[in-house]
C-alpha cells in the first residue's frame, strides 16, 4: 500500500490509512480512496452521533444509519450532526 492516497473527500493526495478500517471489500475501498485525515474526522463525527443519539451498534438499523452517514460525510454531502455539540475552543 502506498503512503498516500487520492482522498475522495478532500480531492487531493493525503496520507493513506495503514490498514482497511472495515472488513471485506468496503474496507479495501475505503483504504484506497479515503485519507487518514478524512477517516479520523469521520470517526470523531461517528462517536458524537453514537453518543448523542444513543445508538447501539448491536442494532442493525443503527449500523445502517452510520454507514449511510459515513458515505454522506466522505462524499461531502450534508450529514446529521450531534444536537447540542459545541466544538472545543482552540
Swiss-Prot record:
Tell me the GO BP annotations in alphabetical order.
cellular response to oxidative stress
Which Pfam family is one of this chain's hits? Iron_traffic
Q: Name one GO molecular function term.
A: iron ion binding
Q: Which cellular component, as a GO term, is one annotated location?
A: cytosol
Q: Which UniProt keywords apply?
A: Iron
The answer to whether the entry has keyword Iron is yes
Q: Please report which protein family the annotation says this sequence is part of.
A: Belongs to the Fe(2+)-trafficking protein family.
The record, for HAMAP family, names:
Fe_traffic_YggX (MF_00686)
- Which function does this protein serve? Could be a mediator in iron transactions between iron acquisition and iron-requiring processes, such as synthesis and/or repair of Fe-S clusters in biosynthetic enzymes.
Protein name (Swiss-Prot/TrEMBL): Probable Fe(2+)-trafficking protein
Amino acid at each position: 500500500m502506498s503512503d498516500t492516497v487520492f482522498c475522495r473527500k478532500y480531492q487531493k493526495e493525503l496520507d493513506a490509512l495503514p490498514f482497511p478500517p472495515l472488513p471485506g471489500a468496503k474496507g479495501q475501498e475505503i483504504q484506497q480512496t479515503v485519507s487518514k485525515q478524512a477517516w479520523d474526522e469521520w470517526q470523531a463525527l461517528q462517536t458524537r452521533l453514537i453518543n448523542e443519539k444513543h445508538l447501539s451498534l448491536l442494532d442493525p438499523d443503527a449500523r445502517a444509519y452510520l454507514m449511510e452517514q459515513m458515505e454522506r460525510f466522505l462524499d461531502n454531502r450534508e450529514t446529521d450532526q450531534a444536537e447540542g455539540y459545541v466544538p472545543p475552543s482552540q
